Amino acid sequence: MTRRRSAPASWLLVSLLGVATSLEVSESPGSVQVARGQTAVLPCAFSTSAALLNLNVIWMVIPLSNANQPEQVILYQGGQMFDGALRFHGRVGFTGTMPATNVSIFINNTQLSDTGTYQCLVNNLPDRGGRNIGVTGLTVLVPPSAPQCQIQGSQDLGSDVILLCSSEEGIPRPTYLWEKLDNTLKLPPTATQDQVQGTVTIRNISALSSGLYQCVASNAIGTSTCLLDLQVISPQPRSVGVIAGAVGTGAVLIVICLALISGAFFYWRSKNKEEEEEEIPNEIREDDLPPKCSSAKAFHTEISSSENNTLTSSNTYNSRYWNNNPKPHRNTESFNHFSDLRQSFSGNAVIPSIYANGNHLVLGPHKTLVVTANRGSSPQVLPRNNGSVSRKPWPQHTHSYTVSQMTLERIGAVPVMVPAQSRAGSLV
């Protein structure tokens, strides 16, 4: 009976010893924070009843930047240490002499990329069972980098401006505090600040808003600042602008007027260049002293050319006065009826008294008339380069006929005194 009772007791003792000798990794503090560039210690310890002859320790990391690619940090196996990922070479090691139940490691010169979740895996054969994994988080803190201060918006009086402040680096994310560097260190009453975004909005800026502003970026391990000088611009006098605008407007108007005048002048000049048909009338000239001629040649025809078709006698009669037809004609054939009057008169003959308009004319020597007729056709129409039409007169021929005064009296001609003209056509 005693043996039966002792058997269950012995089995209970063996089971208790087995539980006591199982491997167990102690709990970690959870998270470790360290500033960038400093040394971080990641704790890990375990308990075991077996000898440490077959101890196997592996440290792994799950980077915060890439959780899908775990990396090996350091390995202890068979009494030797092996390096893990290349970026940890020369920076990682065990804090104690191995083998040992304290398998904590250190990481020198921590970098921002070292942030992540680290796992400690421990195996010590033949010891089995229990929890053999320890988890520790590492956060590498980065102080705020030097922030950049900027002004957004117009600095004119009465405008709204925004002061910006931001740091490229900072873990944890820094907060921003704006202040004006004056006696009160307070922002203007119209300013609204956002410490998370790092902005300050100042509405309706005035001369009191001018000054030096400071932005302080801070987090758990450091601070950094930047300065910004805000100068409100007062409006410039508008008189200068008004004068400049008036001068510019006047200059433009003058240029436009000159252009219009020039255009009108050239248009008028081009119009006046068009040649018009010249009206050349038939003329009757009375000579003071006609040459003496025989009775056979008292009335003769003389063909001559007139240089400028101008009058050369002192008394001039229009040819249509002697024409039976009162309507003027350019054709000089109307004077052919005088060809039948071929009578000769002596140069010394006495002319009887002639009365005109009730006046008694003084007797004098015989006078003759020279009838000058211009024969010409209509002018020729020629096109010009600018689209207008010019008229070019045909060459004209001048014929002169001599008529005695007696003949003129017989047909009832009445002399009329007309002012003499020069060759250029002006009155003398």
Curated annotation (Swiss-Prot):
GO terms for cellular component: cell-cell junction; plasma membrane; synapse. This is Immunoglobulin superfamily member 11. N-glycosylated. Residues 262-428 are cytoplasmic. InterPro entries: Ig-like_dom (IPR007110), Ig-like_dom_sf (IPR036179), Ig-like_fold (IPR013783), Ig_sub (IPR003599), Ig_sub2 (IPR003598), Ig_V-set (IPR013106), IGSF11 (IPR042758). Functions as a cell adhesion molecule through homophilic interaction. Stimulates cell growth. Keywords: Cell adhesion, Cell membrane, Disulfide bond, Glycoprotein, Growth regulation, Immunoglobulin domain, Membrane, Methylation, Receptor, Repeat, Signal, Transmembrane, Transmembrane helix. GO terms for biological process: homophilic cell adhesion via plasma membrane adhesion molecules; positive regulation of long-term synaptic potentiation; regulation of presynapse assembly; regulation of synaptic plasticity; trans-synaptic signaling. Residues 376-396 are annotated as: Disordered. The gene is Igsf11. Disulfide bonds join 44-120, 165-215. One of its GO terms (molecular function) is ionotropic glutamate receptor binding. Its main location: membrane. Residues 1-22 form the signal peptide. PANTHER family: IMMUNOGLOBULIN SUPERFAMILY MEMBER 11. Residues 376-389 have a biased composition (Polar residues). Residues 23-240 are extracellular. Pfam families: Ig_3, V-set. Residues 144-234 form the Ig-like C2-type domain. Residues 23-136 form the Ig-like V-type domain. Glycans are attached at residue 102. It is found in: Cell membrane. Highly expressed in testis and detected in kidney and adrenal gland. In brain, expressed in commissure fibers of the corpus callosum and pyramidal cell layers of the dentate gyrus and hippocampus where it is probably expressed by both neurons and glial cells. It is a single-pass type I membrane protein. The lineage of its organism: Eukaryota, Metazoa, Chordata, Craniata, Vertebrata. The chain crosses the membrane at residues 241-261. The modification Omega-N-methylarginine is found at residue 375.
